[in-house]
């Protein structure tokens, strides 16, 4: 029942989504069910983005490094020696894509959010010309715990300081922020997301058994 009411599909986990060969078809299918789509990519496959027949409702590009040196240190590309160069291509491609664009900066204290990095991020953001810039704090979970520590998590005040310094360099302003999530939104204005018109519908009976919260203990 909850799945039939789904209105937003986030395409981001289980690896880089632009490696999926039927991505455009999947996005189109989501839109046909009246869902918005949010595609999160590391930007290292610009040709895939350029050739998508159907673009997502909103495209998030991870801009986690201000330059190649920091990129190689933090993102640590293993299979693509030219990852930074491909990412750089994506930055210049973004203004030509007819969809909502967000540049997301995941900020790691002591690594990629030093004062000298801010103008470099601004230069990338100005080239990409996104609708919004999202500045969010790194969270010490998952595999990142092998390389980083809890001390690398910035406070919300750090995120706000970074965002307020970045905003005027991109001719934007701080629009909103969330202290619990340690995230700030930089842009010119907040515009409601367009909802695709549904042309396909899920059947009333999906053939899925009702969930069981408590099972009897078998002695």
Mark where each language-model region is.
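Auxiliary Fe-S-binding modules of radical SAM enzymes
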Residues: 95-96, 112-219
């Amino acid at each position: 029942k909850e799945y039939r009411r789904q209105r937003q599909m986030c395409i981001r986990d289980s690896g880089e989504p632009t490696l999926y060969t039927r991505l455009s078809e999947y996005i189109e299918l989501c839109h046909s069910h009246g869902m918005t789509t949010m595609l999160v990519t590391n930007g290292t496959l610009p040709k895939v983005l350029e050739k998508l027949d159907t673009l997502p409702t909103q495209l998030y590009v991870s801009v986690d490094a201000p330059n190649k040196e920091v990129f190689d240190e933090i993102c640590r590309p293993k299979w693509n020696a030219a990852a930074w160069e491909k990412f750089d291509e994506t930055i210049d491609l973004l203004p030509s894509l007819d969809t909502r664009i967000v540049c997301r900066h995941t900020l790691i204290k002591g690594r990629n959010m030093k004062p000298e990095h801010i103008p470099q991020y601004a230069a990338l953001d100005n080239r990409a010309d996104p609708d919004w810039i999202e500045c969010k704090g790194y969270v010490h979970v998952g595999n990142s715990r092998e390389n980083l520590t809890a001390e690398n998590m910035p406070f919300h005040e750090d995120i706000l300081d970074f965002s307020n310094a970045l905003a005027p360099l991109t001719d934007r302003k701080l629009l909103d922020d969330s202290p619990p999530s340690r995230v700030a939104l930089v842009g010119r204005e907040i515009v409601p997301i367009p909802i695709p018109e549904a042309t396909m519908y899920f059947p009333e009976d999906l053939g899925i058994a009702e969930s069981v919260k408590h099972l009897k203990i078998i002695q």
